Amino acid sequence: RTAMIGIPGAWDCHGGVEVNAPQFESFFGALDALMDHLAITPGQSTRWLIDEVVVVAMSEFGRTPLWNGAGGKDHWPFVSAMVAGSGVRGGRSYGATDDGLIGKKVDYRSGSPSDTGDMLGTENLGVALLKLGGVNPDRFLPGIQSFDAILRE
């Protein structure tokens, strides 16, 4: 099963981002309420539903790490994601940026920066999530390497 939650509003704000504060409060409040609810709701095969569910929070694109001249942030090819729940190796950050704030190559098994690694993309995360859900990723994302660093062994 899959559920998707959207917080309405104009998120694509290149200036005056303070107008997004209520949206962030709504989003993180809803996320907090969801996690709390999962932690006290009986699961189907485990004691609590949080032990059966994976929650992913991300956007389809990133934002520049520095402010632009209009007090906002522009589109950026690097994005962050929060992944929590069953089967996920949590409590850490993966990847890195260089001094110019450009994403570095990553070892897909450890999640650490590596000169011999590859650039991490949303498709690599998608393959890992499909594997976590017991779905063969080759059917949907053939030839894409899995970002296994997020998977609990």
Each language-model region and where it sits:
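Feature marks hydrolase-like catalytic cores characterized by long aromatic- and Gly/Pro-rich stretches
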Residues: 10-153
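Short coil-to-beta-strand
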Residues: 1-8
